[in-house]
Amino acid sequence: MHIRMARALVPVPLLLLASALVAQKLPFDVHAMMQLARIGDPQLSPDGRWVAFMVQTVDLEKNTKPKQIYIVPLAGGEPRKIADEADRPRWSPDSTKIAFVSDRGGTPQIWIMDADGANPKQITNLSTGAGGVLYSHDGKNLVFTSEVFPECGADDNCNRQKLDVEKNGKVKARVITGLLYRHWTTWQGARRSHLLTVPVGGGAAKDLTPGNRDVPPFSLGGPDDYAISPDGTEICYAMNSDEVPAVSTNSDLYVVPIGGGPAKKVTINPAADNSPQYSPDGKYLAYRAQIRAGHESDRWRLMLLERATGKLTSLTESLDRWVESFAWWPDSSRIFFTVQDRGRQYIQFISVNGGAAPIALSGNSVLDDIQVAPDGKMMIYTRQSGSSPVEIFRAASGGGAETALTHLNDAVLNAHQLTALEEFWVDGAENARVQGFLVKPPGFQPDKKYPALMLIHGGPEGFWGEDWTYRWNAQVFAAAGYVVAMPNPRGSTGYGQKFIDDINGDWGGRAYDDIMAVTDYVAKLPYVDGDRMAAAGGSYGGYMIDWILGHTRRFKALVSHAGVYDLRTESTETEELWFPIWEFGGMPWDNPEMYQRWSPSLFVKEFRTPTLVIDGELDFRVPYGQGLQLFTALQLQKVPSRLIVFPDEGHWVLKPQNSLFWYKNFIDWIGNWTKK
C-alpha cells in the first residue's frame, strides 16, 4: 500500500520525463555489445596500492580483439592504460615492475615493464613462445610455460630446428600413435607444455618439468595450475601422468625445486587436483579436488595439505556446492573462496581449522577472481550480472558496501536499455524444483503479446544466471523483441551434486521434462504468445535441440549450434573420451542400449520443425560432422533448414565479424517463423 501511495504522489510531468529518458535509450543489440570493454585477470600489487588488469576490446575493421593492461589505485581513481598488445600482468614482489605476455613481436613472449608502463623490456625470445608468467618471491626469476619438444626442453636451437622442419617439410601428415591427440581447436603434435624459468634480466631458460607430459595438463588444465612457494624454493604444479590422458581426469600435484631437479608427487587422489596455492606462511598448500575418477563434473572441494606432516583435510566437505576461485587471508588463518549457487556466485570464507563457512558477499551477481590485500582489510574481485558485464570491485574483507574500481562500460550501458533478469521456479520431473530466468524486451508492455525464445545451456553441467556472456547474450535476443527464457534443468550446476548427477545416463529424460515444464510456464505468461516460441542451444544445448526435434512440435523454429546428433559416432570423434564413458556408462560397444536410447538420430522420422544448424570446422569437442548429419536428415525429409559452417571457428564463434554474422542469422531465422 505504501508503495502504491508513493507512486501516486509522483507528478505526472516527472513520470513523462522518466518515460522519455527510457525511450531515448537504444536497444542493446550486437553492435552495442561489440563496444564493451572485456575486463579480466585483476592482480593486486604486493604493497596493496594498485590493481593491474587486462582489458580486451573489439576492432571490427581488423576483425581482432586486442588486449591491453590497465592499472587503477585500490583506493579508487581513474583506470589508466599502461600497455598495448599485452596480457597476464604479474607484479614483482616489490611492486615496482610488472611482468606480462605480449605477441607484439609475432610470437607470445615474456616482457617486463615499470609499474607505470615505462621501459618495457623483452625477456624471452623463444621459438616456441612463452606464456603464463609468474615472478619468484625473491624477484630474481620468472617462471612461465612454453610448448617445447620434449627431447629439446629449454634448448631453443633444438626447438627452432624442429619447428623449421615442420614448417618447411613437403609432407604435412600427422602421425598419431595414442590418445589424446587434439583438444578444442588444437592438434597435440609432438610438443608438450613445460614449466621453464629464466632470470629477470634475461638469459638461458631452464626446463623444470622435462619429459613427455604437459604442465599444466593439455586438457582440464589452466594458468592457475602452478604456484611458487613463499620461500621461493619450490614450485607446485598439476600434471596428468596417466597412460591414456584421453580417458583420465586424474591430474595430481607435484613439487619441484625452483632450481630444477627430481619432482615429487604430493597427491594420490585418482581424480582431479588443481589450482594449488601456498599459504603466505608456507605451512599449507590449498587446492581444489574432485574425488570420482573420470567425472569432470564431480563436486570441487577445497583441500588443505599441511606440508610438514602430510595431513590432508577437505575444508568444504559439508558444502554441497562447487568451490571456484579462492585466496588466502594474509595471516594464513583462513581462505576466501567463491561458490556458485542458484544462478549466482558468492564469496565465503573458512578457517584452516574447518567449521562453518559464512558468506562475506552475495547478491544478484557472479563474483569471482578474489584477492585479499596484504593488510587483510580489503578484497578485490570481479563482479558481473545478466545485465552488466565484468567490472572490478573492492569491499571490506568481512563484507559490506561494494565500490566499483572500474567503470569502463558505463557510457555504453547508459546509452542502451538493458533489462534485469527475473527469477522463476517450476516443478520439473519428479516434482524437483527447477529454476529459470526471464529477460523481457526493452520498452516492455505488459498488455502486449511477445514471441518467446528458450535458450538451453551447454555442459550439460553448466548454468544460466547472473553472469554476462558475449556468445549467447540474452540482452541481444531480448532487444530483437523476444521474451527470453533460460531454464536450468537437471544437470545444471549450483543446485547440489545430485541435481548435477541426475543428467548422467539420462540426457533426454528428466532434463527434457524440466525444459518442457519451463516451456509450459512461459507459454502461459499473459504477455507471451505461446504459439510463437523458438528454442536454441549450443553443445549439450544443441543436443537438446536435436532431441526436441524428434519429441515435440511446441516450437516454431529451432537453432542447433554444435549439437550432438548421433551419440554413437560423436563418442569416438570427440577428444575428451572420459566424458562419454562417464555419461553413458562406457563406449557404444560397452553399453549400446544407452547410446541407442538417447541418440537424437534415431528419432529422425519425427523431425518437422524448421531448424538452423551452425557448426565450426575447427570444433574438436563436437566435430562438425554432427551438424552435417543433422542437416542432411532435415533436407532429405524436406524440413525447412539452413546450415552455416564457419571454417575458422571451433566450438564457439569468437571472431568479431563471425559473431555479428552469427547473431544476425540466428535472429533472422527465428524471426522468419515466429514473427509472421
Residues covered by each model-derived region:
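The serine-hydrolase catalytic nucleophile loop
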Residues: 449, 460-474, 489, 625-626
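Beta-strand-rich domains and repeat architectures in extracellular enzymes and scaffolds
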Residues: 31-67, 190
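A flexible loop/linker signature enriched in serine peptidases of the S9 family
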Residues: 55-68, 81-88, 99-111, 119, ...
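Active-site-proximal cap/loop segments of hydrolase catalytic domains
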Residues: 473, 478-480, 486-676
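Blade-terminus and WD-like Trp-Asp/Gly-His loop motifs, strongest in beta-propeller folds
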Residues: 43-50, 89-97, 133-141, 226-234, ...
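Short beta-strand element of the alpha/beta-hydrolase
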Residues: 440, 448-458
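Short loop/turn segments that connect beta-strands within beta-propeller blades
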Residues: 73-77, 114-118, 199-203, 257-261, ...
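Non-catalytic accessory segments flanking enzyme active sites
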Residues: 43, 143-145, 171-177, 181-211, ...
